[in-house]
């Protein structure tokens, strides 16, 4: 009885070990990405909006904008990808704030494997702050069709950042931000 159990166990292990020999996938095969990677460009993840006539210093900031998160879902469409992006945009009152809403401008760009920009579009987004609140946010949903030009989707990257004004660029040269 013990001998039969040992033979059966050994045969079972041999059978299971052989299962991998006949599989259709190899260790060298990489799964094909259906979606480009999406990322926020950290140097452009924040912006500052100044009150009219205010200095480009912290006391002159009416609102700060922060790109908090981006997610992407894709669907293949021939030699293109239909991408649905959700971009979380946060608005924060600055010392010179006098309103309860702000319009911020961010961009979505597609880059190739060499980081060259293949396409870029800007999107305005209005962020409202409840009365008395320091911060507010919105999830902006956009849909884009990205031509692949024969490339696999995984070779492309979707990058998101604020379109900076000259005042914001000058501000961030001299101050670290919020």
Write out the residue ranges for each language-model feature.
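Low-complexity, acidic Ser/Thr/Pro/Gly-rich terminal tails and inter-domain linkers that flank the onset
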Residues: 56-78
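Short, solvent-exposed, Trp/other aromatic-anchored flexible loops in extracytoplasmic proteins
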Residues: 124-156
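Post-signal peptide N-terminal segment of mature Sec-exported envelope proteins
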Residues: 28-53
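C-terminal motif of bacterial Sec signal peptides marking the signal peptidase cleavage site
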Residues: 15-18
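Bacterial N-terminal signal peptides that target proteins for export
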Residues: 1-11
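Short acidic/polar inter-strand loop motif in beta-rich domains
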Residues: 163-173
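Bacterial signal peptide processing site
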Residues: 20-24
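Mid-length scaffold segments of soluble, non-membrane domains
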Residues: 74-117
